[in-house]
């Protein structure tokens, strides 16, 4: 892996840029009439389900960042024991579980959780010492993959997932909803990390 020049300020700025991006999505969706959350976005998931899916995985991001900030070692994943994301089938099983959990939440609750998780990410990053946040191999007790990545990279991975997998669908849906190209803030930096 090539060395990547990232600072704690870069990580915090990316979280705030992600917050701005989500605020624009929510505002654009609500700015053109009532939104129930059940509007189909991509033929597979609704608006609320996409947000719930992102939140489900962000809970795991927050858990790992909190473990690093608190020095508590590997956290328990937010999904049931026995589910693992090491294979595509395992990831599909986790996604189905996340989807089932998110269906019990209202759109307002789902959106509120989005911003709460971003706050938790920011707060945890602020508490992790700079060098430990950005040095690979420091937190292998939290996640073995962190042998080659710093804990700060999980923020980048979380952001990349949204903007590679879900942002194009959300932007297309918003554009259709408002009847013109939906202008969203720039994509936050993933710091050059690739998951």
Regions found by a protein language model. Name each.
Residues 24, 86-135:
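Acidic/histidine-rich alpha-helical segments that form the ligand environment
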Residues 12, 16, 51, 55, ...:
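Short amphipathic alpha-helical segments with heptad-repeat character
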Residues 3-7, 44, 94-108, 144-153:
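Acidic/His metal-coordination segments adjacent to aromatic residues that form catalytic metal sites
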Residues 19-30, 58-62, 66, 115-129, ...:
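Structural signal for well-ordered, non-membrane alpha-helices
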Residues 4-34, 56, 60-63, 158-165:
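Alpha-helical bundle segments that constitute or directly flank the non-heme di-iron/ferroxidase center
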Residues 3-5, 13, 20, 123, ...:
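Charge-dense, helix-prone N-terminal extensions
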Residues 35-93, 133-195:
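Short, contiguous alpha-helical
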Residues 2, 6-16, 39, 71-73, ...:
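Solvent-exposed interaction patches of small proteins and small membrane subunits
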């Amino acid at each position: 892996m090539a060395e990547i020049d990232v600072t704690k300020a870069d990580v915090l700025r990316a979280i705030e840029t992600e917050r701005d991006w989500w605020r624009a999505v929510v505002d654009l969706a609500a700015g053109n009439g009532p939104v129930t959350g059940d509007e189909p976005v991509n033929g597979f998931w609704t608006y609320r389900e996409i947000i719930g899916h992102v939140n489900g995985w962000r809970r795991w991001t927050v858990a790992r960042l909190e473990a690093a900030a608190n020095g508590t070692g590997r956290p328990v994943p937010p999904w049931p024991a026995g589910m693992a994301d090491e294979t595509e089938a395992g990831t599909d099983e986790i996604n189905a579980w996340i989807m089932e959990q998110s269906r019990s939440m209202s759109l307002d609750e789902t959106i509120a959780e989005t911003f709460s998780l971003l706050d938790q990410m920011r707060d945890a990053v602020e508490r992790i010492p700079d060098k430990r946040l950005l040095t690979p191999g420091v937190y292998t007790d939290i996640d073995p993959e962190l042998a080659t990545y710093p804990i700060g990279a999980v923020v980048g991975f979380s952001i990349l997932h949204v903007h590679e997998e879900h942002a194009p669908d959300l932007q297309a849906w918003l554009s259709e909803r408002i009847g013109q190209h939906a202008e969203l803030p720039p994509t936050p930096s993933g710091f050059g990390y690739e998951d």
